[in-house]
């Protein structure tokens, strides 16, 4: 069995800004970014950096292999042991592996160095210069590193095996319904021994610890240095099927037996499910047609960039689910396996993607894109959540020959009818199109499915994608667009929510089978001096009004393990003197009653108009006669009974700070570090948020955690936020905040 040594701690790091000006070594743990990021992507660092650590391995059995697994390293990486270069890797979003067997001696302390370069490189996807890019890349070893010790007779690693359509363990659902299911298990076995080895391969599927299906191959003999694929089928009766509403997962245990002894074993989670895409039949999961609401996500987190540990990735997935979304497009690059695991567990359907945005380079770049497509499928093929593979460069002109290579790579790597490639040019299995491009109602190509990849942003920001991204020429009026920070006030937040209301209604009236609004979180970008404020949550994951609109589109009966749903109601106003007297209430209830200072203002049903008629739950609209300070209370009713309640109170003078640590009850596992946002809310004597407050707040920590970035922060819309890094093993840390006069 493989012995995995996690190498996330005890690294030494330095930046090499020039050949003669290396910075001093500093001790760091992974995941790590080589710089503290500002919120807008303006103060990025680019250059060479090095990670070094001591590596000492115990005595090994004969012919064992020792393989270094790097989760991701931005952009290019050189691997050295004791100063000797062993490998170079190009590509910053996918894992790579290096066989260190011949470089490591038993019991000897070796020096492992990874030298990274995150500078612009037109040959490495995404290829486009950072200063022209509508997102950010960062740098460093921003995912985990492991040393995997493989026995002589072993199951290979999917990435490094280099097998088209194979390598490692590949599981596919061949058929599935409520009565039965058939799963294919393809296992790649290699004999690194100097003598032939005889073995059998066993595959077990377990549900809640109980074996629900098992298969054992006949005995095979493998010559020295040879490898073979063993493919078997497992039958399940009355299977637990994976779906967004019920994301049932099995544990697949794959074992190699020599006689009665297990010599290697792998365990992974797997969902039994079948997806389908067609214009006539829509998007189906296990034969059931679903019309899922979705979003787009960039994987960055403030201050730390891409260096988000497991718990932070899971929190983002939970935020997406709780925002009312059951589908997410990973824009525009492969994202963390931890995030993918969370989507598996929470029931979030995923459009996976290779790196690319508005750029297509030369032959070397295109070869790298095809290799990225292959490696992406090999990495993510066993994830239940992945329904679509964007093996295409987003919003990029591509030749027919290049697109044919990308499409073919997907089908070669994942044979059968469950591979659905997609792209913004109609050359793939599924056509993905953005609402601003104007064809979501008119496009048709036989029975091919259409997915609205993006909506709710660009169509309100610029007339089309042809505006000048450098000068801003052609951008529509700011008041009408969807790009609004929380601090811009109530009118801006209402406008964003209204835009999304209209846009979602329009996409639901189209023949599209899935849709994804742009975007779930605000994000930094290279080409613009300010971060993009198009998220339904800001960059610190604080909600805007539009977040609650999407929450309201989920039915009141929906809830699940690991996330909160159910009946909800939200009054979309700050209820201050300048507030609009027409008040929208977002709710998934049948009726809503609004009261002001205890006086009923009416009980209404949803406001169904030509702009809301296709929504599952249109907003409720109340026209108030005048402003009166105090408390607005909305009560939602289902079946005549109160099901949800929300109150908004006119803010008075700031009185105190309230601190919240945004963990969402998701904790790091033992031995893991964490990154979490901490918010200080400026509230009045009644606890109402003072949305106009912009006070400076000073944060202090105790107990071993550290603030990443500034400790003195100006509040936006009454909330000041910082990012805290928590080292592995630190559990009892404290945070305090103070502001003048509070």
Q: Predicted segment positions?
A:
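Accessory carbohydrate-binding/adhesion or oligomerization-edge regions at the termini
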Residues: 1-37, 115, 121, 141, ...
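Substrate-binding/catalytic cleft of secreted carbohydrate-active enzymes
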Residues: 317-319, 327-550, 563-574, 580
């Amino acid at each position: 069995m493989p012995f995995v040594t996690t190498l996330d701690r005890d690294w030494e790091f330095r930046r090499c800004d020039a050949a003669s000006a290396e910075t001093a070594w500093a001790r760091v743990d992974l995941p790590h970014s080589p710089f503290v990021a500002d919120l807008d992507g303006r103060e990025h660092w680019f250059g060479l950096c090095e990670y070094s650590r001591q590596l000492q391995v115990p005595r090994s059995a004969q012919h064992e292999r020792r393989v270094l697994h790097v989760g991701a390293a931005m952009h290019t990486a050189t691997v050295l042991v004791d100063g000797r270069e062993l490998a170079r890797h190009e590509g910053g979003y996918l894992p790579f592996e290096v066989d260190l067997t011949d470089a490591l001696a038993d019991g000897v302390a070796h020096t492992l160095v990874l030298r990274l370069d995150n500078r612009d490189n037109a040959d490495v996807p995404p290829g486009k210069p950072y200063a022209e890019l509508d997102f950010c890349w960062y740098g460093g070893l921003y995912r985990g590193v492991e040393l995997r010790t493989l026995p002589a007779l072993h199951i290979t690693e999917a990435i490094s095996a280099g097998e088209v359509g194979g390598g490692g363990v590949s599981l596919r659902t061949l058929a599935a319904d409520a009565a039965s299911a058939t799963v294919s298990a393809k296992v790649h076995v290699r004999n690194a021994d100097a003598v032939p080895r005889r073995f059998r391969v066993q595959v077990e599927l377990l549900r809640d610890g109980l074996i629900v299906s098992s298969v054992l191959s006949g005995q095979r003999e493998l010559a020295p240095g040879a490898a073979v694929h063993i493919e078997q089928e497992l039958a399940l009766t009355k299977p637990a099927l994976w779906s967004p509403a019920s994301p049932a997962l099995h544990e697949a245990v794959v074992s190699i037996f020599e006689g009665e002894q297990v010599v290697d074993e792998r365990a992974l989670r797997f969902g039994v499910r079948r997806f389908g895409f067609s214009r006539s039949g829509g998007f189906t999961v296990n034969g059931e047609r679903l019309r899922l609401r979705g979003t787009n996500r960039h994987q960055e987190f403030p201050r730390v960039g891409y260096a988000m540990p497991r718990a932070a990735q899971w929190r983002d997935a939970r935020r997406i689910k709780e925002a009312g979304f059951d589908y997410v497009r990973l824009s525009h690059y492969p994202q963390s396996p931890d995030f993918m695991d969370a989507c598996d567990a929470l029931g979030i359907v995923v459009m996976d993607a290779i790196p690319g945005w508005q750029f297509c380079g030369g032959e070397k770049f295109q070869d790298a894109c095809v290799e990225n497509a292959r490696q992406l499928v090999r990495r993510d093929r066993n994830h239940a959540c992945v329904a679509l593979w964007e093996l295409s460069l987003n919003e990029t002109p591509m030749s027919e020959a290049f697109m044919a290579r990308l499409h073919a790579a997907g089908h070669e790597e994942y044979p059968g009818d469950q591979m659905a490639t997609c792209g913004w040019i109609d050359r793939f299995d599924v056509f993905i199109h953005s609402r601003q491009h104007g064809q979501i109602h008119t496009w048709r190509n036989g029975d091919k499915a259409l997915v609205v990849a993006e909506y709710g942003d660009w169509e309100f920001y610029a007339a089309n994608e042809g505006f000048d991204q450098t000068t801003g020429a052609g951008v529509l009026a700011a008041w009408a667009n969807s790009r609004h920070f929380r601090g811009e006030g109530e009118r801006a937040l209402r406008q964003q929510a209204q835009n999304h209301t209209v846009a979602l209604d329009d996409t639901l009236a189209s023949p599209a089978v899935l849709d994804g609004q742009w975007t779930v979180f605000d994000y930094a970008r290279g080409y613009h001096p300010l971060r993009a404020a198009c998220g339904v949550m800001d960059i610190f994951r604080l909600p805007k009004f539009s977040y609650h609109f999407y929450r309201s589109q989920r039915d009141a009966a929906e809830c699940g393990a690991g996330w909160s749903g159910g009946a909800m109601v939200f009054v979309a106003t700050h209820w201050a003197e300048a507030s609009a007297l027409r008040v929208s209430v977002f709710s998934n209830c049948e009726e809503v009653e609004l009261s002001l200072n205890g006086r009923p203002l009416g009980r209404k049903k949803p406001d169904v108009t030509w702009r809301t008629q296709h929504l599952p739950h249109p907003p409720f609209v109340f026209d108030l006669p005048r402003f009166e300070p105090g408390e607005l209370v909305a009560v939602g009713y289902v079946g005549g009974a109160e099901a949800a309640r929300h109150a908004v109170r006119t803010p008075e003078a700031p009185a105190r700070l309230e601190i919240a640590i945004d963990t969402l009850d998701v904790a790091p596992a033992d031995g893991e570090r964490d990154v979490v946002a901490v918010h200080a809310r400026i509230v009045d004597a009644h606890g109402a948020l003072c949305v106009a407050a912009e006070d400076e707040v000073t944060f202090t920590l105790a107990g071993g955690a550290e603030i990443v970035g500034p400790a003195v922060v100006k509040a936006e819309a009454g909330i000041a936020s910082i990012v805290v890094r928590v080292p592995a093993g630190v559990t009892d840390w404290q945070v305090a905040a103070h502001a003048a006069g509070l």
